[in-house]
Amino acid sequence: MSKAVVVFSGGQDSTTCLVQALSQFDEVHAITFDYGQRHSEEIEVAKALTSELGCASHKIMDVSLLGELAISALTRDAIPVSHELMDNGLPNTFVPGRNILFLTLAGIYAYQLGADTVITGVCETDFSGYPDCRNDFIKAMEQALNLGMDKQLNIHTPLMWLNKAETWALADRYGKLELVRNHTLTCYNGIRGDGCGDCPACHLRKRGLEDYLSNRDAVNAELTKKTGAN
């Protein structure tokens, strides 16, 4: 029996990954992390989506220590989300160590479940400047987990080379475009669906959807070229 663990936030990307995983694996488990994030409503959204989509289990893990250590606009309500980059060239929504911690814990969970695949929705094409969304990081993390647990564990990143329009097309391929559009939470300000319309996450999501809806055939053709599936 094939098993996978999906790192699941209830946002557009991780929901698209979950939908795809449910069609590809016999047993899919979701894991959501509560780190005191600004958009904490995403945890309730994640609960609702995993229930509706039918995961084998949904684990919510308290990692509030990350929120205490990592100072970011996503962990401090007093820090407004900015469209400008910080002095280090990163957005102020970057949470240092987040994906290192998430993938480590998801890997441990997969080990206990007997799953050999961890799925995460990180993307280098539209990665907002986050270094822990790069393919080089994922490969290094995969190697570290394999060595550290003496287990063959695959970190699968189905969105790594897709742009946002292609991610919308992937959700549509599985018949879940409207679910992703109306019931996920990507907005940094915690508003479901189309979100606040002002934060960087909302801008990226909206632009991708508009690109897809106005160029469906071309976007689907590019998606097929990248994924090798119809």
Swiss-Prot record:
Cofactor(s) essential for the protein: Zn(2+)
Top class in the EC scheme: ligase
Gene Ontology BP terms: queuosine biosynthetic process
Keywords associated with the record: ATP-binding, Ligase, Metal-binding, Nucleotide-binding, Queuosine biosynthesis, Zinc
PANTHER family: 7-CYANO-7-DEAZAGUANINE SYNTHASE (PTHR42914:SF1)
Biological pathway: Purine metabolism; 7-cyano-7-deazaguanine biosynthesis
GO molecular function, one term: ligase activity, forming carbon-nitrogen bonds
NCBIfam families assigned to the protein according to its UniProt record, in alphabetical order: 7-cyano-7-deazaguanine synthase QueC, PRK11106.1
Protein name: 7-cyano-7-deazaguanine synthase
Function recorded in the entry: Catalyzes the ATP-dependent conversion of 7-carboxy-7-deazaguanine (CDG) to 7-cyano-7-deazaguanine (preQ(0)).
tRNA processing is among the record's keywords: no
HAMAP family attached to this UniProt entry: QueC
Enzyme Commission number, as recorded: 6.3.4.20
Catalytic activity: 7-carboxy-7-deazaguanine + NH4(+) + ATP = 7-cyano-7-deazaguanine + ADP + phosphate + H2O + H(+)
Similarity-based family: Belongs to the QueC family.
InterPro entries: QueC (IPR018317), Rossmann-like_a/b/a_fold (IPR014729)
Keyword ATP-binding found: yes
Annotated binding of ATP, by residue: 8-18
Cofactor stoichiometry and binding remark: Binds 1 zinc ion per subunit.
Pfam families named in the record: QueC
Organism of origin: Shewanella amazonensis (strain ATCC BAA-1098 / SB2B)
